[in-house]
């Protein structure tokens, strides 16, 4: 009996292994992918890719397999690109082939291929072209984006003055002001800083970005086929984004009730007008789902990335007080103590510009980039990537490529200055990605970073609560994003 039972268990195990191998073979793509660590059926490369240090795991694998290699995220093969040359060759030199959006499973349940950031094919081209046009028109219209940022910076300075030099956590001070800039474009108005609905919205955005960077989210991205049916923290992202969608859908209803097609007030109005124009076209991409999700894409990206960069920037400037002093000297020389900073000042302030670039480079807010996908069978560096293969361009590995930055792991503004102290560009500076999927809001984000940093440092000096040498810039969480550590500082009026 015991032998018979053992034999039955053995047969069951063999049968289970056979089923796993059959399933594994079905998900294998034809073609010739780059080399990489040997995967375990279904589990993939879980043993080599730590869910709490995914980016660092990829860098370690690069040491063995080179700048282009394959890892299996669960049963799914993903091609990893490291360093400037490999990423540029794919995203710029072969821009069309690598222009697809890869799978971001942790939010796919919410977006289902809709919205400009996660769409593909003709839907993506239509939504991107429309979004770029509207952002450009608002940037050059009666009330430019620069004026909106300057106005919002003024409100922020007033809030900082109210603190009277007491210690504060800058997180929501910065997210409120940055979010109000994109709010004025997509919603047509700004929120009061104490608006409870606005604060709730910002907390959801902040929490979503954090949740997308947790080990749970990385695990979900690897095993979404199973984990979508299981309870746990990984589902928190889904519910947060659904709440954000509900908020935007409610704003759309408000706009629709008072829409004047001759006088669009914001991005939502412009999209609604296009929806009415295309109402008899059953195949139009101008529908309610794409409106809500594209608005969410713009609002989310326009809030969290810039405010996180500012938070990191405050830390780095306090850690290097000589840099803060030199920026203030440049502000005094070019702008003076009273005039409001403008974008035109940037070309006359090479050191400040270099510092802002170096903050973005060193902190690399989205180190793994957003996944790409090859839209057709693609020959790349002697390999064949079958149509539909996901590709991770590791932006963090480009921003810290030692071939292009002599001190890749240090804060060194001279990376962006020539021997005469003039600003110099660096082709490996890609915090907004590159190629056809480059960030829609790059111009706005660059404008915000310059105007906020100069406005704040023109009016306040930043003081840490610990000695500069003890300031730690290690991310609180590092996954999809590098989440800044929580800290307090004092803003002393000049």
Swiss-Prot record:
Q: What is its EC number?
A: 1.14.14.1
Q: Which Gene3D superfamilies match?
A: Cytochrome P450
Which coarse location class describes where this protein primarily resides? endoplasmic reticulum
Q: In which tissues is it expressed?
A: Olfactory epithelium.
PROSITE patterns xrefs:
CYTOCHROME_P450
- Enzyme kind, highest EC tier: oxidoreductase
Which one GO biological process term can you cite for this protein? epoxygenase P450 pathway
CDD domains attached to this UniProt entry: CYP2G
Q: Which gene encodes it?
A: CYP2G1
| GO MF, one annotated term | oxidoreductase activity, acting on paired donors, with incorporation or reduction of molecular oxygen, reduced flavin or flavoprotein as one donor, and incorporation of one atom of oxygen
Reactions mediated catalytically: an organic molecule + reduced [NADPH--hemoprotein reductase] + O2 = an alcohol + oxidized [NADPH--hemoprotein reductase] + H2O + H(+)
Q: Where in the cell is it found?
A: Endoplasmic reticulum membrane; Microsome membrane
Write down the required cofactor(s): heme
Membership in a protein family: Belongs to the cytochrome P450 family.
Coiled-coil residues are none
Question: Which positions are annotated as binding heme?
Answer: 439
UniProt key word Membrane: yes
The alphabetical list of record keywords is: Endoplasmic reticulum, Heme, Iron, Membrane, Metal-binding, Microsome, Monooxygenase, Olfaction, Oxidoreductase, Sensory transduction
Membrane protein topology class: Peripheral membrane protein
Organism ancestry: Eukaryota, Metazoa, Chordata, Craniata, Vertebrata
**GO CC annotation, single:** endoplasmic reticulum membrane
Function (record text): Cytochromes P450 are a group of heme-thiolate monooxygenases. This isozyme seems to be implicated in olfaction.
Name of the protein described by the UniProt record = Cytochrome P450 2G1
InterPro entries, sorted: Cyt_P450, Cyt_P450_CS, Cyt_P450_E_grp-I, Cyt_P450_E_grp-I_CYP2A-like, Cyt_P450_sf, Cytochrome_P450_fam2
């Amino acid at each position: 009996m015991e032998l018979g039972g053992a034999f039955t268990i053995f047969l069951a195990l063999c049968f289970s292994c056979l089923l796993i191998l059959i399933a594994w073979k079905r998900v294998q793509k034809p073609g010739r992918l780059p080399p990489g660590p040997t995967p375990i059926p279904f589990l993939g490369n879980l043993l080599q890719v730590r869910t709490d240090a995914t980016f660092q795991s990829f860098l370690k694998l690069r040491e063995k397999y080179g700048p282009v290699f394959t890892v299996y995220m669960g049963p799914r093969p993903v091609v990893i690109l490291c360093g400037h040359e490999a990423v540029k060759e794919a995203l710029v030199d072969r821009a069309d082939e690598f222009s697809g959006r890869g799978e971001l499973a942790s939010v796919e349940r919410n977006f289902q291929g809709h919205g400009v950031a996660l769409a593909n094919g003709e839907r993506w081209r239509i939504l991107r072209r429309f979004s770029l046009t509207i952002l450009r028109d608002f940037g050059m219209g009666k009330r430019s984006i620069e004026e909106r940022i300057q106005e919002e910076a003024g409100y922020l300075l007033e809030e900082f003055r109210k603190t009277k030099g007491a210690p504060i956590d800058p997180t929501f001070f910065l997210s409120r002001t940055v979010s109000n800039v994109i709010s004025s474009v997509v919603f047509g108005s700004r929120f009061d800083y104490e608006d409870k609905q606005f604060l709730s919205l910002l907390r959801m955005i902040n929490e979503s970005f954090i949740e997308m960077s947790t080990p749970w989210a990385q695990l979900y991205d690897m095993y979404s086929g199973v984990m979508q049916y299981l309870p746990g923290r990984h589902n928190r992202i889904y519910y947060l984004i659904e709440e954000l969608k509900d908020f935007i859908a409610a704003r759309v209803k408000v706009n629709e009730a008072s829409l004047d097609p001759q006088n669009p007030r914001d991005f939502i109005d412009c999209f609604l007008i296009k929806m009415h124009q295309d109402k008899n076209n059953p195949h139009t991409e101008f529908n309610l789902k794409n409106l809500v999700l594209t608005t969410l894409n713009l609002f989310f990206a326009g809030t969290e990335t810039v405010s996180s960069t500012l938070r990191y920037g405050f830390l780095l400037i306090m850690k290097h007080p000589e840099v803060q002093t030199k920026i203030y000297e440049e502000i005094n020389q070019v702008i003076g103590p009273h005039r409001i900073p403008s974008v035109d000042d940037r070309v006359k302030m090479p050191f400040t510009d270099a510092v802002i670039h170096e903050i973005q480079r060193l902190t690399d807010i989205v180190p793994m980039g957003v996944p790409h996908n090859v839209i057709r069978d693609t020959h790349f560096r002697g390999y064949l990537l079958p149509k539909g293969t996901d590709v991770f361009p590791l932006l963090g590995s480009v921003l810290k490529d030692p071939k292009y930055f002599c001190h890749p792991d240090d804060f060194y503004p001279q990376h962006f200055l020539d021997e005469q102290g003039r600003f110099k560009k660096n082709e490996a500076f890609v915090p907004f990605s590159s190629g056809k999927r480059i960030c829609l809001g790059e111009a706005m984000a660059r404008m915000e970073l310059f105007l906020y940093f100069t406005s704040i440092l023109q009016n306040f000096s930043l003081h840490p609560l610990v000695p500069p040498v003890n300031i730690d810039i290690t991310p609180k969480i590092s996954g999809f994003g590098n989440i800044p550590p929580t800290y307090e500082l004092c803003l002393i009026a000049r």
